[in-house]
Amino acid sequence: MNDEESHISVLPVMNKQTSLVLQNLKEETENQLKELEKKRSQLHKEEQINLQLVYAINDLRSKTKELKAENEKEDTFLNSFNASGDLTANKKIQLREQSRKLEESLLSYHKKVKEMEKQHRSASSKLELAKLSAQQLQTNVNVLRSQNNPEILQDMISETKDCRSLIAEQLLQSASLLNDFQNDSDRIAKNHSSLIDTSRAHRVSLTNATKNYTHIFDSLLTFTRHDSEDVSTSVEKLTSKKISELEKLFADYCSIEDAFD
């Protein structure tokens, strides 16, 4: 067998090996693309979670304004009460109910803030995991690139770059959102503490005002009772006197009046 015949006999074997290598590369590329698609879906879910967090923060801001407005109304009502010194039973019940509802709202509000912080930490952890996965995909791409098949890998390289860009953008957005959320959380905590203190002050003022009101009422009642007893005593004394004594008292009174005239 000459050299030409030997070369021809080797070609089918080389073509078969090349086909196998290309087939393996194709399968691995498809697997990598599927993995990238999963990561893209995961990033989309993280975006939705972040949007929900933004909406929730805006809702909490709105509720904070409502609580502040409600607290200002209570301040106005309490100031009006202290100025007038008059508090009916219905107003006392209403103020107690408003204070109770305010504390319940604040406790529920604080609990919701804690839940949001937990959700945001979970979202940040998932984003970090997605970043590590993208780095691993890039490593796999570099390994395949070293096999000198740029035509086969071009699509996967492009997908990997897009995925990395998307992850980087998502991480920046999450960092900004986390910073805003932290600032809002600090302000919310201060407002929560302030509202709790104000509510307690309202209850103390209400208690003191009720004590003062009760003391005044008891004093007036005692004074009225004493006056009534004095009048009754005077009437009894007058009725016990005889007609002649009354006439003498009246004459004495008239003489005193004439003397002043």
Curated annotation (Swiss-Prot):
Species of origin: Schizosaccharomyces pombe (strain 972 / ATCC 24843)
Gene Ontology biological-process annotations: actomyosin contractile ring assembly actin filament bundle convergence; conjugation with cellular fusion; mating projection actin fusion focus assembly; mitotic cytokinesis
Keyword terms, alphabetized: Coiled coil, Cytoplasm
Superkingdom classification of source: Eukaryota
Keyword ATP-binding: no
Name recorded for this polypeptide: Uncharacterized protein P8B7.02
Subcellular location: Cytoplasm
Coiled coil: 16-147
Primary localization: cytoplasm
